[in-house]
Amino acid sequence: MTNIRKSHPLIKIINESFIDLPAPSNISAWWNFGSLLGVCLILQILTGLFLAMHYTSDTATAFSSVTHICRDVNYGWIIRYMHANGASMFFICLFMHIGRGMYYGSYTFSETWNIGILLLFAVMATAFMGYVLPWGQMSFWGATVITNLLSAIPYIGTNLVEWIWGGFSVDKATLTRFFAFHFILPFIIAALAAIHLLFLHETGSNNPSGLMSNSDKIPFHPYYTIKDILGLMFLILTLMLLVLFSPDLLGDPDNYTPANPLNTPPHIKPEWYFLFAYAILRSIPNKLGGVMALVLSILILAIVPLLHTSKQRSMMFRPLSQCLFWLLVADLLTLTWIGGQPVEHPFITIGQLASILYFSTILVLMPISGTIENRLLKW
């Protein structure tokens, strides 16, 4: 008799995805982040569900409902902080996952890569709308500033912004629809993640060498299930250290003040994981130009496969490209720091230089380095 996990229509899918899946024998810890992102998504959906049971999406009661969750609901404080800091862990894993894809040339799986970009946009949209829900000062002003950027779109901009707001300013209608979208988007993300996996399993995983590994595959279980559990332990440990010892470390103190349309905070800034894009937005004096740079800073990932000039897939044996990759990482950290600083000298200049370096590294320097490496190897 055939084993049930190989014959049952439903269990067979799970078996082929997580148990008998042939995986390269040499994939490193950088391949752990996919499973960690899945865990983060499940954690966010579960904690979010329990928060939604007590939250009210009304401008009059939203702030006090979050306070009520933290003070009166059984373990509400830990659910709230796990959800808030879980978003930070989600983005850390996301950035590591994308970095891994760029370093080892995983972007040559074009369908998987493009769905990954869609996932990134969906997660960013979800996180942005979630940040608005507590209805603190930074929630309100962040929503006002970021949605108002759409008014830079010629001809339809103003109408588009008012349509999104549901009125002439960020108000009750905006909060209600943001809550609705924030609730539904994670399920869309889960569906996209399943498609992401489907396309990945069509080609099989990449590996650090970037070479074909069909001749040397091992079953996913038990080798990589154990390895993923180790990564999961580190993730949970880091998250719980953050939640239990310094839950507000990554938040903004202004968000503990209820939203007030008549009082603007001194420095309006988004959560830390958007600061790099925010710095690029601010580095261009023109509003439309800034919005275009903001969108392109993420959308540029879509043309990374087209800019691959090297005859080697991975950067494992390409020292020049490795230097440029780590320059890009340092540049993104610089942009993140600049995004959190006030708009004054010398931060403006540093931000502009870092923005130029970001685009030129991806669009110009990396393709050139690939060509140079080909020449050096006489290919």
Swiss-Prot record:
One of its GO terms (molecular function) is ubiquinol-cytochrome-c reductase activity. The chain crosses the membrane at residues 33-53, 77-98, 113-133, 178-198, 226-246, 288-308, 320-340, 347-367. Binds 2 heme b groups non-covalently. InterPro entries: Cyt_b/b6_C (IPR005798), Cyt_b/b6_C_sf (IPR036150), Cyt_b/b6_N (IPR005797), Cytb/b6-like_sf (IPR027387), Cytochrome_b (IPR030689), Cytochrome_b_C_euk/bac (IPR048260), Cytochrome_b_N_euk/bac (IPR048259), Di-haem_cyt_TM (IPR016174). PROSITE patterns: CYTB_CTER (PS51003), CYTB_NTER (PS51002). It is found in: Mitochondrion inner membrane. One of its GO terms (biological process) is mitochondrial electron transport, ubiquinol to cytochrome c. Its cofactor is heme b. Signal peptide: none annotated. SUPFAM superfamilies: a domain/subunit of cytochrome bc1 complex (Ubiquinol-cytochrome c reductase), Transmembrane di-heme cytochromes. Keywords: Electron transport, Heme, Iron, Membrane, Metal-binding, Mitochondrion, Mitochondrion inner membrane, Respiratory chain, Transmembrane, Transmembrane helix, Transport, Ubiquinone. CDD domains: cytochrome_b_C, Cytochrome_b_N. One of its GO terms (cellular component) is respiratory chain complex III. It is a multi-pass membrane protein. Heme b b562 binds at residues 83, 182. A ubiquinone binds at residue 201. Heme b b566 binds at residues 97, 196. PANTHER family: CYTOCHROME B. Belongs to the cytochrome b family. Heme 1 (or BL or b562) is low-potential and absorbs at about 562 nm, and heme 2 (or BH or b566) is high-potential and absorbs at about 566 nm. The cytochrome bc1 complex contains 11 subunits: 3 respiratory subunits (MT-CYB, CYC1 and UQCRFS1), 2 core proteins (UQCRC1 and UQCRC2) and 6 low-molecular weight proteins (UQCRH/QCR6, UQCRB/QCR7, UQCRQ/QCR8, UQCR10/QCR9, UQCR11/QCR10 and a cleavage product of UQCRFS1). This cytochrome bc1 complex then forms a dimer. Component of the ubiquinol-cytochrome c reductase complex (complex III or cytochrome b-c1 complex) that is part of the mitochondrial respiratory chain. The b-c1 complex mediates electron transfer from ubiquinol to cytochrome c. Contributes to the generation of a proton gradient across the mitochondrial membrane that is then used for ATP synthesis. This is Cytochrome b. It comes from Galidictis fasciata (Eastern Malagasy broad-striped mongoose).
